[in-house]
């Protein structure tokens, strides 16, 4: 068992980039046919993979900055300007700040000059996964707008999913909702 975050990386934690592919190749060469991992969902307070916001969404910390460069959404220079991540432990605060920064850059680049193939893939994914993705993206956008507070501490109409309040949130937070979908 090895969680991808335990793979070697210069970017704070291991991700689903080149080192994950190398690990899978190693498993295959050793005759292994399975890679057992801990849950891969987005984590909240405490950063435990067993305490996730979603059964379906992926943890954005597992997005490889190098693959975003390959897709033309970031530059090598942008990911080279990473913080000095500690060795031997994870500084989740530093990681979140940096990952959120580069994911925002990648999203802006995607929105302003979308690659046709990437755009088509995104739209296909968003349509295919809308049964969970729409609510998840709304939840994350509202959580961000609420200062990352626990949903139990949100204003009563939001907490109780008042239809009119949620519709207003969908309109007011449209850009952030799309960003959350993009990160998936």
Language model regions located:
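Acidic/aromatic-lined carbohydrate-recognition and catalytic surfaces
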Residues: 1-184
């Amino acid at each position: 068992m090895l969680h991808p975050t335990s793979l070697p990386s210069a970017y704070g934690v291991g991700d689903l980039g080149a080192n994950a592919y190398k690990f899978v190749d190693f498993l295959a060469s050793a005759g292994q046919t399975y890679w057992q991992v801990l849950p891969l969902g987005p984590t909240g307070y405490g950063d435990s993979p067993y305490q996730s916001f979603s059964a379906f969404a992926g943890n954005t910390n597992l997005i490889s900055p190098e693959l975003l460069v390959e897709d033309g959404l970031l530059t090598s220079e942008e990911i080279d300007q990473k913080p000095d991540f500690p060795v031997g432990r994870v500084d989740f605060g530093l990681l979140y700040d940096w990952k959120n920064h580069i994911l925002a850059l990648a999203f802006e680049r995607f929105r302003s000059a979308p690659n046709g193939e990437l755009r088509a893939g995104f739209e296909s994914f968003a349509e295919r996964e809308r049964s969970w993705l729409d609510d998840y993206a709304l939840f994350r956008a509202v959580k961000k707008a609420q200062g990352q507070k626990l949903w139990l501490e949100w204003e009563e109409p939001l907490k109780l999913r008042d239809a009119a309040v949620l519709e207003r949130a969908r309109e007011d937070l449209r850009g952030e909702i799309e960003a959350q979908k993009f990160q998936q």
